[in-house]
């Protein structure tokens, strides 16, 4: 069985070279907000306000929705982030994943759940672990963002069905 695969490099906010409803699966991991300079002009996230960061990501989700075939999937790997006190006057967790879910649902992508990707082990295998700090002051616990989400979305409509030959070859 012969298949064709094309790699197109460009800005995901404007995927003009990719026809409407021509992609069957999108897997993406957007740039982190304010954490990494990727060294490209007009990059998303670095030196952006949070609002601009989310607006740029929303342009990406709109383009993903346009190129995604009906009934097919978008998978987004994203982690929430601590906001520095410079931005909010205090430290807090910014739930970026919830912004993505809200926008994608608004443009017609159904949220199908998430996979939690535990990036490091936090299990104390020696048996002496503590939860939320240590006795007698557990209220001073440290929250670690050592996981990311893999958000799963499905575009409304009927997905293309594999042929008998495709099934047999798989």
Residue ranges and their predicted role:
Residues 1-170:
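Core catalytic lobe of class I
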